[in-house]
C-alpha cells in the first residue's frame, strides 16, 4: 500500500483547476451502454474509480478509444453477453460501487442482467432498495442467487410507470432514468434526486434522443423511445474538489485562485464555507480565497451554535462535511457537524483529536468542533485513510500541521482525486508518495 508523507505548515499560492466531476463520470459512463452508436465524453478525471469502470466497460465488449487526455469515445455495438454472466464480471462489480448503475442500462438494452452486490467506501449502509423497486415498478423481476452471491434481473418488456421514490437517491434515480428511456410509455419519477450530476446525465440522454422533461427538479417525466444514438458530452468541474481546495487554502492561511469551478453548479457549497468565516471572492468562473489568519464561525440569529448538516440537493453534499469539519478545527467559535445521510463518516475524527483538535463525537452522526482560532496548531500524526473523503480531510489536516505526517492506504484518495500530490506540490504543498 502506498503512503503520503506530508511536510505541513507550508503556504499555498497561485492557481489550481479542478478535475472533471467523479460522480458525474460514473453515471455518464454507464449511459454509454444504452446505444450501439459512439458516445464521446470529455473532461473525464484520471482517477482509480473512473479508470476501473472504463476497464470494466471495455471487458463487456465496448470499444473504448482514448482520443486525448480526459477524452474518450465509447461504442457499445456488440456487448459480450457471456462475459456479463461470468465470475470475473461479478467480482469486478463487487469491488466498484459505481457499477450498480449498470443495472438500468443493461436491463433496458438486453432485458436481463446478473449483478453482484457492489463495494465502495466503508461509510455505513447504503441501501439498494430504491434501485430495485424502481426496476420492479417498470415491470422487471429479480431474485437473489445464493450460489453466485448475485441478483438476477429480468425485464424483456419494460413499461413506463408512476413512482414516488422513498428516498431521493442519486444513483437510484440515475438507474431508473436509464432504464426508463427505452421503456414503453411514460415514466414519472417523483422525489427524484436533482443534483447537477443527474441534470448532466439527463442532458446527455436527451442529446442521445431521450425525452426527459423536468430536468433540475424532483419531478421527472420520461417518454420512452425506441432507441438512442451517439452524442458528445463534457463533464462539469468536480464540486467536491473545489470544496477541498477551499478548505486547504483556508486552513493554511493561503491565497489561492481556483479556476473554472462551474460556480452556478456549486449550489450552497460556497456559503457553507462562508458560514465558517472564510472569505470567498468570485471572479468570472474562478473563485479566489484571500489569505486569512483568522476566520470566525457564524452563529444562528438567536445566538445558538451553528449547525452544518448534509441534505439532498439543493442542500449540502455529504461529501464535503469531512472537509468542513477539519477546517472548523482552526476557526474561531464552535459548530455542530451533523452527518445525516451516512453513519460512519465521522469515525476518522479520533485521528484529528490525536492531532490536538477539540472535537466531541456525540454519536455516529454528530460531532461538535471547538475551533482553535489558529492559537494552537494541529500536530503531525500517522493515519490510515478509511475512505475517499476522510482521506482528503486527513490530507488537509496534515498540510496545516507543523512537522511530518503520514497517511497510509492512499489508494482511497486516488479513487477520487487525480494526481493530487503533484497538483498540490505545484502550488506550494510538500507531499511525497512512498510505495
Question: What is each PLM-predicted segment?
Answer:
Residues 1-435:
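Short, structured segments at the rim of ligand-binding sites
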Amino acid at each position: 500500500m502506498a503512503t503520503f508523507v506530508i511536510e505541513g505548515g507550508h503556504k499555498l499560492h497561485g492557481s489550481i483547476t479542478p478535475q472533471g466531476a467523479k460522480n458525474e463520470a460514473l453515471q455518464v459512463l454507464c449511459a454509454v451502454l444504452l446505444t450501439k452508436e459512439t458516445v464521446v465524453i470529455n473532461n473525464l478525471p484520471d482517477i482509480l474509480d473512473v479508470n476501473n469502470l472504463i476497464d470494466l466497460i471495455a471487458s463487456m465488449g465496448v470499444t473504448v478509444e482514448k482520443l486525448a487526455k480526459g477524452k474518450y469515445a465509447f461504442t457499445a455495438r456488440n456487448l459480450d453477453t457471456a462475459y456479463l454472466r461470468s465470475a470475473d464480471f461479478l467480482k469486478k462489480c463487487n469491488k466498484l460501487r459505481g457499477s450498480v448503475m449498470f443495472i438500468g442500462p443493461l436491463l433496458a438494452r438486453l432485458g436481463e442482467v446478473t449483478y453482484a452486490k457492489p463495494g465502495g467506501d466503508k461509510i455505513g449502509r447504503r441501501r439498494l432498495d430504491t434501485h430495485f423497486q424502481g426496476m420492479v415498478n417498470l415491470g422487471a423481476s429479480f431474485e437473489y442467487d445464493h450460489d453466485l452471491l448475485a441478483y438476477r434481473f429480468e425485464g424483456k418488456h419494460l413499461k413506463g410507470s408512476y413512482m414516488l421514490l422513498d428516498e431521493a437517491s442519486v444513483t437510484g434515480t440515475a438507474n431508473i432514468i436509464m432504464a426508463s428511456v427505452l421503456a414503453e410509455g411514460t415514466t414519472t419519477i417523483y422525489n427524484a434526486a436533482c443534483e447537477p450530476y443527474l441534470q448532466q446525465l439527463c442532458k446527455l440522454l436527451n442529446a442521445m434522443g431521450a425525452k426527459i422533461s423536468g430536468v433540475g427538479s424532483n419531478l421527472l417525466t420520461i417518454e420512452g423511445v425506441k432507441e438512442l444514438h451517439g452524442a458528445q458530452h463534457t463533464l462539469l468541474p468536480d464540486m467536491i474538489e473545489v470544496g477541498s481546495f477551499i478548505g486547504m487554502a483556508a486552513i493554511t492561511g493561503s491565497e489561492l485562485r481556483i479556476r473554472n469551478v462551474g460556480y452556478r453548479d456549486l449550489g450552497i457549497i460556497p456559503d457553507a464555507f462562508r458560514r465558517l468565516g472564510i472569505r470567498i471572492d468570485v471572479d468570472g468562473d474562478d473563485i479566489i480565497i484571500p489569505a486569512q489568519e483568522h476566520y470566525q464561525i457564524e452563529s444562528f440569529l438567536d445566538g445558538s451554535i451553528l449547525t452544518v448538516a448534509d441534505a439532498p440537493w439543493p442542500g449540502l453534499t455529504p461529501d464535503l462535511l469531512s472537509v468542513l469539519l477539519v477546517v472548523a478545527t482552526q476557526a474561531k467559535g464552535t459548530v455542530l457537524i451533523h452527518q445525516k445521510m451516512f453513519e460512519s463518516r465521522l469515525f476518522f475524527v479520533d485521528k484529528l483529536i490525536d492531532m490536538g483538535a477539540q472535537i466531541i463525537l456525540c454519536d455516529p452522526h454528530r460531532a461538535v468542533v471547538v475551533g482553535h482560532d489558529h492559537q494552537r496548531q494541529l500536530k503531525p500524526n500517522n493515519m490510515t485513510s478509511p475512505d475517499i473523503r476522510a482521506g482528503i480531510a486527513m490530507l488537509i489536516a496534515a498540510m496545516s500541521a507543523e512537522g511530518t505526517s503520514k497517511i497510509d492506504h492512499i489508494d482511497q484518495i486516488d479513487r477520487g482525486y487525480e494526481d493530487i500530490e503533484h497538483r498540490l506540490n505545484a502550488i506550494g504543498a510538500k507531499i511525497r508518495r512512498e510505495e
